């Protein structure tokens, strides 16, 4: 084995020379240079500085402006709440531990950090799934005479929490476990060992199928159908400049959102899958740390894509930031008239 396994950790470094120490008790500077740990801390600080304001502003704007408190926007608020879990439950902890070079909060702290970081990430993931389904239902109308309302929006939000808990809670009660990962300064699900005592293999398979493959399939299907429907409508109304513009905006939105999803989750899932299917193979701590950067960065770019590209939200944010005056001269409700045509389809 090219790593060292302890009772509640796995360090991706052979202990042939006897230098490996518990990531809960000693700095892990044999895994990476001290400056690399400092860079990790700096990156976490950047995520906090950028991630907290934009997500907090989303919630604040919703309280201040009634016209954005619509059922179709509930899931966007849920996304902002999920990102706060990631900021406070994961980023702040990793910032502190990176400055010390090891996970100073012990095994219990690892469980808590792993749980909240996973919970926030999974709520965000399933929020994107629900958002795709909602847009598919509203635009493509697979069910005739169906009207999307507040109860449906609340059910969608509740669904994201149920699915997130179904992923984040089992490691706390004996199905898999949370251990330090990468440079041993943050905690996540154990992809490194089979650990039959906690049925780790079955949980990892469950994770890849239910919490990666299925969400990705749903998102690709819904947005594929959405683009097809909008293009078909545009072809039937070629003389309408508004319809043509909406088609281009929707297509652009779908491309951006699919790419964002892939950037966020594919690197992390791919590396985790490789590590799990190549038990004992030689890999450095950076291999798992870098993909985690992409996943954690979603707390910044997901709000930008899904919220700030929403014209209603954007106008209200500008009005709030500029003390009640939109510098671009657009009124908060300027998109209300076209809401059924574009704002429910695309956040552009």
Curated annotation (Swiss-Prot):
Q: Which cysteines are joined by disulfide bonds?
A: 110-187
Residues binding Zn(2+) are 201, 279
Topological domain ranges for the Extracellular compartment: 1-36, 97-110, 174-202, 275-286
**Ranges facing Cytoplasmic side:** 62-73, 134-152, 225-252, 309-348
Report the principal subcellular site: membrane
Membrane topology reported for the UniProt record? Multi-pass membrane protein
Q: Which InterPro entries match?
A: GPCR_opsins, GPCR_Rhodpsn, GPCR_Rhodpsn_7TM, Opsin, Retinal_BS, Rhodopsin, Rhodopsin_N
* Protein modification: Phosphorylated on some or all of the serine and threonine residues present in the C-terminal region. Contains one covalently linked retinal chromophore. Upon light absorption, the covalently bound 11-cis-retinal is converted to all-trans-retinal. After hydrolysis of the Schiff base and release of the covalently bound all-trans-retinal, active rhodopsin is regenerated by binding of a fresh molecule of 11-cis-retinal.
Which residues have a glycan attached per UniProt?
Answer: 2, 15
Phosphothreonine-modified residues are 335-336, 340, 342
Query: Which residue ranges does the UniProt annotation give for the motif 'Ionic lock' involved in activated form stabilization?
Result: 134-136
- Sites where N-acetylmethionine occurs are at 1
Q: What UniProt keywords are attached to this protein's entry?
A: Acetylation, Cell projection, Chromophore, Disulfide bond, G-protein coupled receptor, Glycoprotein, Lipoprotein, Membrane, Metal-binding, Palmitate, Phosphoprotein, Photoreceptor protein, Receptor, Retinal protein, Sensory transduction, Transducer, Transmembrane, Transmembrane helix, Vision, Zinc
Q: Where in the cell is it found?
A: Membrane; Cell projection, Cilium, Photoreceptor outer segment
Which family is it part of?
Answer: Belongs to the G-protein coupled receptor 1 family. Opsin subfamily.
The entry's function note states:
Photoreceptor required for image-forming vision at low light intensity. Required for photoreceptor cell viability after birth. Light-induced isomerization of 11-cis to all-trans retinal triggers a conformational change that activates signaling via G-proteins. Subsequent receptor phosphorylation mediates displacement of the bound G-protein alpha subunit by the arrestin SAG and terminates signaling.
Record's protein name: Rhodopsin
Q: Which gene encodes it?
A: RHO
